[in-house]
């Protein structure tokens, strides 16, 4: 029997099984509209997923920052260890998670993942309450594994829940909700970590404040579990797809394809943003000690940066056009270089730091949005998913490199705020490279 016949038989069996369980018919997507029950359920589930991830990561990051109770547990630059623990599962499991999402019902996979999250949330609460840094790090790692599997599930599910004409708007709404959830998670982490650290007695948290991280996590995880239960049943898209246990095979074949044209260069420039983000998010928790402020006030710095990036992205998207798209990239890189350079030299005062972070975050939108648009436009229709998935995997690789850079520079006794100078210098290099590419591109077009 041919593989085609086997696939046909598998698809027929899946269709029969799905009919019995009354899955949502794909052809009814246009009738359902954008704000249907399934999409709203997914939107809320993703919101609480992003919030819970950032609560545990935020509290742990504050706990290992300079002057914090767990500062010495992981050595200098403990924030880099936290960043690596959160990033590695995405690097290793994104492609494998995509295969699971294709061959299984995405709504069913979501419920399984959210059920696992309930158990992990209980483990997280216990480890923070008993003051175990390594236990809390292990909990973060497991949460990252769940999120790595959920990533391809949620983005694949969007196309099954809304009509093609609503897909771009749906993606925008999900991304906006994710950014809001990240900000909420960081703010909650700042509030919780302040009271949790204040309750430390003899190296361990005491009293009711010891359970604050666990309570915050439990609220977000339970709400995410409840919202996922309202997802409609969805049929597997490729039930006969083989499971490739090699997590890197898809990356290798797609990278070879991308290297044949400008896609790989665009993806490299796009992923550089996530390298920068990883370094910056490792630096900022140390500003509690550098500026002499509370964790809550430090979370305001993070929230201000996130809001500014969002505003910059919206502005860049509004001004974007194919003709000027590439020109925005060196402008954004140059703005990042100036902003980070000034942050590395700025005095230890809250207001100037917040202002510089907001300004730098705003210009970041002019760097990332044009590259995202070019990545989508250059990728062929039949390989766009793999191209964007591979680029997403690369972004986490660069994020791990960024966390490693922070860790290495801290071990060399470089003050955290001075690392901004290194990041600014790298952004200057990227600006020069993109300007050179634009010059060559213009010369080639003129010669043609």
Where are these regions (language model features)?
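Transmembrane alpha-helix termini and helix-breaking/packing motifs in multi-pass membrane transporters
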Residues: 59-70, 125-130, 184-217, 290, ...
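C-terminal transmembrane helical hairpin of 12-TM major facilitator-type secondary transporters
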Residues: 327-368
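Substrate-agnostic recognition of the 12-TM MFS/MFS-like secondary transporter fold
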Residues: 40-58, 82-101, 105-120, 135-194, ...
């Amino acid at each position: 029997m041919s593989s085609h016949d086997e696939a046909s038989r598998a698809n027929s069996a899946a269709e029969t099984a799905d009919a019995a369980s009354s899955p949502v018919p794909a052809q009814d997507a246009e009738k359902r509209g954008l704000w249907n029950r399934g999409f709203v359920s997914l939107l809320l589930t993703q919101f609480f997923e992003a919030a819970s991830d950032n609560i545990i990561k935020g509290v742990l990051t504050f706990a290992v920052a300079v002057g914090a109770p767990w500062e010495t547990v992981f050595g200098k630059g403990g924030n880099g260890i936290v960043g690596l623990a959160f990033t590695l599962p995405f690097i290793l499991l994104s492609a494998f998670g995509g295969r699971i999402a294709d061959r299984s019902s995405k709504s069913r996979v979501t419920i399984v993942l959210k059920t696992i999250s309930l158990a992990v949330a209980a483990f997280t609460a216990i480890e923070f309450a008993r003051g175990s840094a390594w236990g809390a790090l292990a909990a973060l790692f497991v949460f990252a594994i769940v999120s790595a599997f959920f990533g391809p599930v949620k983005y694949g599910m969007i196309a099954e829940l809304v009509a093609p004409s609503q897909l771009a708007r749906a993606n925008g709404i999900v991304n906006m909700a994710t950014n809001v959830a990240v900000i909420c998670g960081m703010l909650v982490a700042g509030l919780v970590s302040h009271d949790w650290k204040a309750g430390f007695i003899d190296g361990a948290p005491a009293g009711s404040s010891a359970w604050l991280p666990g309570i915050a996590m439990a609220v977000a995880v339970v709400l995410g579990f409840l919202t996922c239960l309202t997802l409609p049943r969805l049929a597997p898209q490729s039930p006969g797809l083989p499971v490739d246990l090699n997590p890197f095979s898809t990356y290798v074949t797609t990278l070879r394809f991308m290297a044949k044209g400008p896609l790989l260069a665009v993806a490299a420039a796009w992923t550089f943003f996530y390298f920068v983000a990883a370094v910056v998010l490792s630096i900022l928790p140390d500003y509690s000690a550098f500026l002499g402020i509370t964790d809550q006030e430090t979370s305001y710095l993070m929230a201000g940066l996130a809001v500014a990036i969002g505003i910059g992205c919206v502005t860049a998207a509004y001004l974007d056009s194919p003709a000027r798209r590439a020109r925005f990239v060196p402008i954004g890189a140059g703005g990042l270089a100036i902003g980070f350079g000034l942050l590395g030299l700025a005095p230890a005062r809250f207001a100037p730091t917040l202002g510089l972070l907001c300004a730098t975050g705003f210009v970041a939108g002019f760097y990332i949005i044009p590259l995202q648009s070019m990545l989508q436009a250059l990728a062929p229709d039949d390989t766009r998913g793999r191209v964007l998935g591979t680029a997403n995997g690369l972004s986490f690789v660069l994020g791990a490199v960024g966390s490693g850079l922070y860790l290495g520079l801290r071990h060399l006794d470089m003050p955290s705020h001075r690392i901004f100078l290194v990041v600014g210098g790298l952004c200057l290099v990227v600006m020069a490279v993109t300007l050179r590419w634009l010059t060559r591109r213009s010369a080639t077009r003129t010669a043609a």
